[in-house]
Amino acid sequence: MNSKQEKLAAFERLLDIMDELRAKCPWDKKQTFESLRYLTIEETYELGDAILNSNLSEIKKELGDLLLHIVFYAKLGSEKQVFDIADVANNISDKLIYRHPHIYGNLKVNNENDVKKNWEALKLKEGKNRVLGGVPKGLPSIVKAQRIQEKAAGVGFDWDKSEQIWLKVQEEITEFEEEVSKGDLKRSEEEFGDVLFSLINYARFLKINPDNALELTNQKFIERFDFIESKAKQLEKKLSDMSLSEMEAIWKESKNQSSSPDSNNC
């Protein structure tokens, strides 16, 4: 791997390229914080895909794209004479040192949970006077629910056992079924939200990432549906002309293939 000096040289090279692009490239010269925002979100999701696919080559590539965005934002900040990349790096370094007193101070912790609780306590001391105030409003709903639950748990508002949460899940499902039977769409939607929130909480307790779990299922469904499409082409049929029973038979074939010992599919 590269030495520390080589890493610093590579980062300096990126900074120099950013300066030159900002000065000479018509596209780069036009960019603002606002215009880059949606591109940054897209790059973040592409990194997430690479991680889920365990593709180290793509992870490296997508990390580079995100690093470019960080450098770009810092360049924009420096042009406004508000902050530069050194300020960004020093700010996060200061934060890490402050929030890790068990490493850089005298605080004693026994486990990971102690670290998380102390982290949230320090955030409150910093002026973030609401525990859930730091959860971004724009987070995807599943991720937001997980972060809400983690932050609440960080100050002791949590269940003792996973069995308690599972009972809560069953309770919420019963309430949802009752509203569905009444035909009340608004109340059904609310209760369905409660079911999802409880399931996400149960997953958290089991140390399952619910967003990752759902995305793996999404990918599995896509692969199996692609299999149906491929089979339909082999049979010279359109999906719209196939019966549900025909498609279900091919679906089962796909499941059998993906569960075989020699298969690497989901």
Report the location of each language-model feature.
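Flexible "arm" and connector segments at domain edges
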Residues: 1-62, 68-192, 196-266
